[in-house]
């Protein structure tokens, strides 16, 4: 199978490395210097240093060439750009008249200014296309690149898209599950990043494992309430892309969003944290959108409220936690 991966950050590189073991895989990056470096070193030192890339993986800086690689009906395109870049890539595919027959995205979050989920952006930019979906689940790029076991879910309304994605990814140490709840999968992937900031704050303040468990559990309830309000199915949020991804992101030391929370608890400013991070922390990007949508829909999300208060309103992390503890008692 021919596969094109668009985006050579840590996640795109890791997925391309996995795919190249079985398939004719091409990894596209906008930065020609990065492409040259990848080809010369067989390592993405910028985003995934120390991981040797498969000898069969090829690299490309020209988007039209990369898209042409994935045009056939038995091919697949994987969009590994962040949410902020998804709409532009869809427009580029449309303008180049090279929309792949089947494609999936792996970004998580809401578009900041429009509050759109990824599938809504795709539908707006490519209204005549139908075979697309989202690939998501509990996964750190470095572990995937190292060939460690992982389970992901592809959600799409298109059976053909689900089948192509399964055929491409389901091998080696990667297990793929299929479904059609695109909204539920996307909401889980977005909200868990915000909740991971909350657990990072709690852990950074030394509040203990009981507090962490409470935040994960009540955070899952918030995620599910919002997801159902937006059209997702409740059972999706107890699966890989809901509870599974939340557990990993909230507790794993490779989590950028958890790291943001830990550093906020230590007294660092958000600007300094993001400047030093060097990578996207989607929880920061989409927290306002999540809270805005929740308020609009009448969905109670107190943990998300507390995170936004710390991120954007100057509330001290310990004061935000105290506010949560002072909430009125209620039935679970």
UniProtKB/Swiss-Prot annotation:
GO terms for molecular function: glycerol-3-phosphate dehydrogenase [NAD(P)+] activity; NAD binding. It is an enzyme of class 1 (oxidoreductase). Sn-glycerol 3-phosphate binds at residues 108, 137, 139, 192, 245, 255-257. Its EC number is 1.1.1.94. This is Glycerol-3-phosphate dehydrogenase [NAD(P)+]. It comes from Burkholderia mallei (strain ATCC 23344). Keywords: Cytoplasm, Lipid biosynthesis, Lipid metabolism, NAD, NADP, Nucleotide-binding, Oxidoreductase, Phospholipid biosynthesis, Phospholipid metabolism. NCBIfam families: PRK00094.1-2, PRK00094.1-4. Belongs to the NAD-dependent glycerol-3-phosphate dehydrogenase family. It comes from the Bacteria. Disulfide bonds: none annotated. Catalyzes the reduction of the glycolytic intermediate dihydroxyacetone phosphate (DHAP) to sn-glycerol 3-phosphate (G3P), the key precursor for phospholipid synthesis. NADPH binds at residues 11, 30, 108, 141, 256, 280, 282. Pathway: Membrane lipid metabolism; glycerophospholipid metabolism. SUPFAM superfamilies: 6-phosphogluconate dehydrogenase C-terminal domain-like, NAD(P)-binding Rossmann-fold domains. Transmembrane segments: none annotated. One of its GO terms (cellular component) is cytosol. Signal peptide: none annotated. One of its GO terms (biological process) is carbohydrate metabolic process. The active site is at residue 192. Pfam families: NAD_Gly3P_dh_C, NAD_Gly3P_dh_N. It catalyses: sn-glycerol 3-phosphate + NAD(+) = dihydroxyacetone phosphate + NADH + H(+); sn-glycerol 3-phosphate + NADP(+) = dihydroxyacetone phosphate + NADPH + H(+). It is found in: Cytoplasm.
């Amino acid at each position: 199978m021919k596969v094109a991966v668009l985006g050579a950050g840590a996640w795109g590189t890791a997925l391309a490395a996995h795919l190249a073991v079985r398939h004719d895989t091409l990894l596209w990056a906008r930065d020609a210097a990065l492409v040259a470096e990848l080809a010369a070193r067989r390592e993405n030192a910028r985003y995934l240093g120390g991981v040797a890339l498969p000898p069969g993986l090829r690299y490309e800086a020209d988007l039209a060439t990369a898209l042409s690689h994935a045009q056939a009906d038995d091919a697949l395109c994987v969009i590994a750009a962040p949410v902020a870049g998804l709409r532009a890539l869809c427009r580029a595919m449309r303008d180049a008249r090279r929309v792949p027959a089947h494609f999936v995205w792996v970004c998580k979050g809401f578009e900041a200014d429009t509050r759109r989920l990824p599938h809504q952006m795709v539908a707006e930019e490519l209204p005549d296309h139908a075979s697309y979906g989202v690939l998501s689940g509990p996964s750190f790029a470095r572990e995937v690149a190292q060939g460690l076991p992982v389970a992901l879910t592809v959600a799409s309304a298109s059976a053909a898209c689900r089948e192509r994605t399964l055929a491409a990814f389901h091998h080696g140490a990667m297990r793929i599950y299929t479904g059609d709840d695109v909204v539920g999968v996307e909401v889980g992937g977005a909200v868990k990043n915000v909740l991971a900031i909350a657990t990072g704050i709690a852990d950074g303040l030394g509040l203990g494992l009981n507090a962490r468990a409470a935040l994960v559990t009540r955070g899952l309830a918030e995620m599910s309430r919002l997801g159902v309000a937006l059209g997702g199915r409740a059972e999706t949020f107890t699966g890989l892309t809901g509870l599974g991804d939340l557990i990993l992101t909230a507790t794993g030391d490779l989590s950028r969003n958890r790291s943001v929370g830990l550093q906020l608890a230590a007294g660092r400013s958000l600007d300094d944290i993001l400047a030093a991070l060097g990578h996207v922390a989607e929880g920061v990007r989409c927290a306002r959108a999540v809270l805005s949508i929740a308020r609009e829909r009448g969905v109670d999300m107190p943990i998300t409220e507390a995170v936004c208060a710390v991120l954007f309103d100057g509330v001290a992390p310990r004061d935000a936690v105290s506010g949560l503890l002072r909430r009125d008692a209620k039935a679970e």
